[in-house]
Amino acid sequence: MADASQATTPAAEGNPVPEVPETQTPPADVNGTTEQEQTEEGAEQALEDQPFVVTIVLPNTTETLDIPVSPMEQIHEIRQSIIEHPIAIEFSCFHLEFNGKKINDFIQVSDVEGLEHGAQLHLVEDPYTEKEARIHLIRIRELIGASGDRTDTVHGVLAGVSVHDDIVVENPDAPEAEIKEYDFQAPADLAILLPKETGPAPKSIKSISLSPWNPPPAYWRQKGHLLYLVIQTNEGEQHHVTAHVGGFFVNRCSNAKFDPLPKPAPKDCASHSLFTLLKKLSPSFEESFKKFQEFSSQKDPLATFQVGNTIPSAPWLVPSINSSLIAHEADNTRSQETYLLGGAENVDSLRDWNEEFQSAKELPKETIQDRVFRERLLAKLFADYTDAAARGAVLVARGEVAPLNPTEDKDAQIFVYNNIFFSFGADGVGTFTSEGGDEAARVATGKDVLGVKLVNQLDIDGLYTPGTVVIDYLGKRIVGQSIVPGIFKQPEAGENQIHYGAVDGKDIVAADERFAPSFEKLATALRVKKHAVWDKENKRHDLEASVEMKGLLGTDGRKYVLDLYRITPLDIAWMEESGPEGSEYPHRMTVLRPELVEALAKQKTREYVQAELLKRGIIKKPEEKKEGEEATEEAKTEEIKTEEAEKSEEPKAEETEKTEEASESTEVAEKKDEEAAKEDERIDISNFKFALNPDVFSGQVPQTEEEKAEMAQDEQDVRDACTYLRDSVIPALLNDLKESDISFPMDGRSLTRLLHRRGINMRYLGKLATLSEGTRVECFRQLCVREMIARAFKHVAAKYLRYLPLPLTSACLAHLLNCFLGFGLNSSPVAEVDEELRKVFSDADYSFEQVTPENLREAMQQEILHRFRFTLEDGWYNQLQHVQMLREVSQKLGVQIQNKKYAFVATEGEAEPVAEKPVAPAPAPVEDGNKKKKKKKAARETSPVAAAPVATVPHTFSPDDFVNVVPIVKDSTPRSALAEEALEAGRLSIYQNQKKLGEDLLLESLSLHEQIYGLVHPEVAQMYHTLSQLYYQLGQKDAAVELSRKAAIVAERTVGLDSSETVLNYLNLSLFLHQRGDSKEALLYARHALDLWKVIYGPDHPDTITTMNNYAVMLQSIKAYHESRRWFEESLRVCNKVFGEQTVHSATLLFQLAQALALDQDAKKAVDRMRESYNIFKTLLGPEDKNTKEAEHWLTQLTHNAVSVAKATKELQARRAKGSLGFSPRNATAGAAGIGSVVPSAVGVDNRNIDELVKFVENSEKKKGGKKSKGPSNPKKRGGKA
């Protein structure tokens, strides 16, 4: 089984590093310099870039601060390091001086003349401005723990939470018995998705907020007054404080009297820093602040750092609203934060997004320092914009932003908020009427943001894109774009607003030559062929890109590219295919994925090279060509994956050791081609071109015979691409899954990521499910079916939610989920709508109340038939895994639901409905809110048996269960090319046995990732994950453990507590800890990963086979042989269920189980299992195979040992009439109790053989580096050739 464990030990299989994509390999000769010169220059540059230490001299104290700095750093980074240091936390408004001269914050360290190791920089306090005073107040409040909880419309409840510290900290001294025991059949425990409740944090001060006297009147502003604050200390004293340009002082104000002058001595108190002032005002402040710091330091720092450059993950399951984890506390300053962050006029938060994007893009990128600064600025800018767009979209969806065209239809309305242009992802003006209307428009927006992301990643000089974000929220799709200068300008008579591409549909086509060079570069990178299109007058225009892609010359003189939803051709094979009756696809926007086009281009390139080699006679036709074809076939899928790994925005969490092996074989095949080419001059592939025409099959009508012939060829090329997808890519994926060459996806997200990497559109889920029927990938079929059902529910729910007011959405969601998942508890659910809300929203669409389980199923079945051309089997709704399906639909809709024991089926009497909330009859009488809550709570605590009337029949879900809905955001943020180049260079160096250089480059890549993205970001989590594997291969286990721990925490906070990436990171952490010797802690993390697996997938996921094997091996390392045996047995059960009994997988597991039984001193069963293993190996692999011979050798040894045990047993039975049972009965087979009764004697009878057996197993495990645990993933590897 492909699993995390395999990814951690590729070195054992002779694969030291993952494949380095050929595109990243540096040329041998750069700018005419030799390799030696480059090395010398690099060494000199490295010496110049060596970090050194400077001393910071602090004011008003004798303490100094030593800070390591790099010549590449900017001064403001040193400022940040000072602010974060414990002895300098009180400073925020200051500048640095060197030799008496002020240093500019935005220059590099190397630009400061004379600044070297040991130099002293003086920290000089600056006068405050109003903005600086506000920033200082916000920072001090957060620093001392005085800021309360924030209600966030975008991030959701408990956003960015981590449970890592609870896994071990919860019970650090747990007895080994608790670690060993595990209930394999227990249902998923959702409690593991919630952090443990802790007591309230110690308060260093009661409150600190803006005073009612704020803001200062004009007279006092002239005197330097900036803000007025009111502070209440733990001693119960209240102080009014003036924030002055020179610092903070206690004034004479009271709640009734305004007098902002300083208090006279001896009650006067003043300081430049508010933190220092608090120490003077409150005698207990320092002590309580220390306690607060100790409380905060209980968690890993990464678990508490602010999530900066990405939207934190919002868990789908959250605690009850009464939980202390989400308790809403009084905080006067919460409502003042808008002012504190944005100022009195709120101008601080108003930004010209488009100008910022394009100005950042135009920054120089000649040097490494330039690129670091540019990419860091872009990463921050994209993150800020995405966050602002998401917030604006939520307000638009809730109807809180006035439209610019209020008289238009709702779907056609447009909005501007916070300098971002918003529109709905619907066909409000009829643009997509011929393509499928609203459905086509919705898909086009998703494809557009993907196209913008690709263009941003390509980073073509002189070509600009607007900031683009797509937000799905409560059934609405909203597009947020930065405002391109001139986009709203009405064109002059005879002019077109669009300068390149289609204008007014396709009636007019513009082809401004100023756009041709930039579009040519873009087309080359995207594999788009230059082609002809015709306008309504049949006039020919030669375009570099799709006619749908538009070029606009902004009033700022920049060339903008818009409407990137058609960068690839249509999937004509899908459109022409006739599915089941009634399965007409809802739109014509069925484009191929860019990953597929790129993979096909690589395949065509390889075929071209092979043909050239054949033409030159370098390779022969029969044998060699056949082998080449095999290598090509082997490499097809991997090429897709390699290229997509470079372009995909998703973390590479599903990559495994088997994938890396496939990559290596691909690389070998490519190197053979290259070496062969060198024998007879280098093959010039510049003459080979592969590009597709994206406008075929879209209504273009060629005029001449030559044009018709060219169009026919273009159409054939696109058909070949469709054939490649269906006949090569999809079968290759299924074959890789069958052979366990890649990990099985765990849920909808990982399935989507896997298919997209391979270039497979999600509309092929039905085809994949059909092809998987009755094969060894049955669980893959089940996952495909689950994903289709979840997507169908999402689409049906969106239709009811789209035009519903926000307060009614909880009732709608509860009713739809009761019909979908709760019909087993109540087959006729009734929607519970608050009658007060019904009166308020009397014109709302209450059609969701008419939904029944039956018509909901029918609607979902139609969605699946239309979108996936797949027919669900009868009774599919009775086979649903309720928890897993609830998780899937919650994540797709952005729902955050309360944690409680949801009853999905009616039992004979009692427990499940206890947690449920009964539904009141409709219409229900209006009651006092508190009384209503009490009545509902009482009803939950009674048995459903007594609830005879319809009004008290329990429902699985009630509106109160839905805590929040968060927006689902798709952004266009590019990845850092610089950080990835350093990573690939480090991998390449290690692959070439330049370990020291490789490690330096890897550390440099890590530093770049952290600098550019910040510490808490999905890309950084992936970097930690990759680096932990590489360090493990290099034998640096401590570093591998630390990095994998960081990867797990950051993944939890950015991609989800129960994401597949998080599971993988915990499995790696477990394995690395075990290899380091911390098996007990390793077992805790492995158990957590398995518990997450149950929540995500349910029982019996194929990859858990390897994980259970690893767990068993860890148990053996702590001498828990009997418990280890149980894990091997469970692993074998799952393997037999997934792959069948007569397979190499099962034979390998039987081999390992036999060893475990021998260690558990169950000699007879050990012999039986080893014999089964031997017979399967012999049948499948032949008697001469190494696996077969090894199994035969062990069978002989175990048989000899069993005979000795049997003799000892007979002697004991003769001496004693009654044997004491040493262990509880094990497997229910004949003679088990007898064997159990003589375990103590067995050791004495054949002590030498058992000791050898233990030694053999443990040494084998150590020598193979965990190879034994990987058996199930590819058992052929155990003996080499299979």
From Swiss-Prot:
GO terms for cellular component: cytoplasm. Residues 624-661, 668-680 have a biased composition (Basic and acidic residues). Residues 623-650 form a coiled coil. Residues 1264-1282 have a biased composition (Basic residues). Residues 37-47 have a biased composition (Acidic residues). Gene3D superfamilies: Tetratricopeptide repeat domain. Disulfide bonds: none annotated. Residues 16-36 have a biased composition (Low complexity). The keyword Cytoplasm applies. GO terms for molecular function: mRNA binding. Residues 1-50, 624-680, 913-945, 1257-1282 are annotated as: Disordered. One of its GO terms (biological process) is mitochondrion organization. TPR repeats lie at residues 1021-1054, 1063-1096, 1105-1138. It comes from the Eukaryota. Keywords: Coiled coil, Cytoplasm, Repeat, TPR repeat. Residues 331-575 form the Clu domain. Pfam families: CLU, CLU_N, eIF3_p135, TPR_12. It is found in: Cytoplasm. CDD domains: CLU-central. mRNA-binding protein involved in proper cytoplasmic distribution of mitochondria. May associate with the eukaryotic translation initiation factor 3 (eIF-3) complex. Belongs to the CLU family. This is Clustered mitochondria protein homolog. It comes from Neurospora crassa (strain ATCC 24698 / 74-OR23-1A / CBS 708.71 / DSM 1257 / FGSC 987).
